[in-house]
Amino acid sequence: MPTHTSKTRKLRGHVSAGHGRIGKHRKHPGGRGKAGGLQHLRSHFDKYHPGYFGKVGMRRFHLMKNPLWRPTVNLDRLWTLVPNETREKYLGKNTEVAPVINVLQSGYGKVLGKGRLPDTPVIIQTRYVSRRAEEKIKQAGGVVELIA
């Protein structure tokens, strides 16, 4: 039933306004933050956060971080990993020094052979390389350096 005044207005003039004599609505009656999830707030945690507490399964002591991790990049995308200034400096010009493209720094693990490379010698550092990619890089006058 709607009333004219709210509960707080009704309780004006009563010493503790419904909050008891001793604590008087002070401090942290249920503990701070998520305290008491296993004790006095258990029903709330069980209903709204099932599985919040406890462990599941077994620990793997000698877990290897994904040994098959090797995101791939194709030959036609190799020059996009290089900054624009470097690209303009080397592409289409005969220079004594070949640019080094470290594929691993860009987040790739393997170079695949799709697409064409410009006829500019380049040194490519990678963990894995396909046979066709290596052939095409050598055909363009470049070198593949395998790094750990």
Curated annotation (Swiss-Prot):
Protein name: Large ribosomal subunit protein uL15B
Family: Belongs to the universal ribosomal protein uL15 family.
Miscellaneous comment in the UniProt entry for this protein: There are 2 genes for uL15 in S.pombe.
Keyword set includes Translocase: no
Intracellular or extracellular location(s): Cytoplasm; Nucleus; Nucleus, Nucleolus
Residue(s) carrying Phosphotyrosine: Y108
GO biological process assignments: cytoplasmic translation
Keywords associated with the record: Cytoplasm, Nucleus, Phosphoprotein, Ribonucleoprotein, Ribosomal protein
Primary localization: cytoplasm
Gene: rpl2801
Protein species of origin: Schizosaccharomyces pombe (strain 972 / ATCC 24843) (Fission yeast)
Keyword Nucleus assigned: yes
Family annotation (InterPro entries): Ribosomal_uL15, Ribosomal_uL15/eL18, Ribosomal_uL15/eL18_sf, Ribosomal_uL15_CS
Biological role: Component of the ribosome, a large ribonucleoprotein complex responsible for the synthesis of proteins in the cell. The small ribosomal subunit (SSU) binds messenger RNAs (mRNAs) and translates the encoded message by selecting cognate aminoacyl-transfer RNA (tRNA) molecules. The large subunit (LSU) contains the ribosomal catalytic site termed the peptidyl transferase center (PTC), which catalyzes the formation of peptide bonds, thereby polymerizing the amino acids delivered by tRNAs into a polypeptide chain.
Residue ranges with Basic residues bias: 1-13, 21-31
Pfam family, one: Ribosomal_L27A
A single Gene Ontology CC term: nucleus
GO MF annotations, alphabetized: structural constituent of ribosome
